[in-house]
Amino acid sequence: PASITKILTCIVALEMVDDLDKQVTITDSDVETVWETGASAANFTPGEVVTYRDVFMGAMLPSGADACRALANNTCGSQEKFVDKMNDLVKKLGLKDSHFVNTTGIHDPNHYTTAYDMAKITQYALQNEKFVEIFTRYQYNASNGLHQWVKKVLYTCKRDHMNVSMIEGCKSGYTSDAQHTLSSMINVNNHHYICVVGYSKNKDGYNHCTVNDTITLGNYVGSHYKEVNLLQSGNEVTKSSVSDGEKNKVAIKIDQDINIVLPNDYNEKDIEYKQKVKTFTAPVKKDQHAGKLDVYYKENKLGSYTLSTVNNVAESESVIMFRKIKNILIPCVITVFICIVVLLIVRQFILKRRRRRRRRR
């Protein structure tokens, strides 16, 4: 994966850092081996005081291996413990074709992933607002005024007059074994996609290979896929059973529009809806949560949507009458029972007194 590894590094660290403005001090351990391995650096120096935000930006924009090492050392105390957390997240996401041995992406036979797995890691990371801020940043000035970074992969493209507006956020990487890699969030027709390019090469006049490949893929999606409205918010999709109600069914509706991106030549027969709907006991309130609707296209799950009830369902008259009778009878029964118990106690007391009198005679 090369330096797109740093997407995983950043999200693992972000989940352990509450305050991005908290200051940390760069140590010798943070910068050691960086130059020897030929890794990219944010050019931090031992003793330098920076914020966590600076360190995250240093990992993402100039692809600083020193920044990644600083994140690991400050959050876990060592590179090894941090890498364990990286692999723990990989397992949590159910990714079976990935394993990481360092925080930077320096080549190692046991450090590997796939485009699919990297897309899932990026998708997970983009659920974190702080990560989105870092991932989509184009330029950044460090808080101590000592560093200014730019996202080089996009900067060089803009310098050569390429239109890269489709790419809203990205992380690039390169090693001789992985070649050029890029994991991006792209915007195509106002829809966001994650695009991962690996083993891309600049050759025969084909420059900015990963960006060109990403734009090519984005343009393909834009010309071969379209947004389809399958259901509108409020559409009735099914009915559910109601016990003890004036009606034995309640209508169930979808809570939001279902807009799905599908191939231009999609077949409606390939779309499948799977409902998980609750049953109810009256009274039922309007807009009460009723379950979920999963949408599949060719057996691939595209989304899960909440369901709710269309209307109120009151209790049946017989249930109401039974409750009234129960509310009257139960206190009466309890009162009678208490009276019987009291009478039995009194009777027992009287009998005992009579026995004592007889004995005295």
Q: What do the PLM-derived regions correspond to, one by one?
A:
Residues 1-116, 120-129:
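Active-site-adjacent loops and short helices of periplasmic peptidoglycan-processing enzymes
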Residues 95-96, 107-355:
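Domain-terminus/edge residues, biased toward the C-terminal soluble/receptor-binding domains
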Residues 357-361:
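Short, charged juxtamembrane terminal tails flanking transmembrane helices
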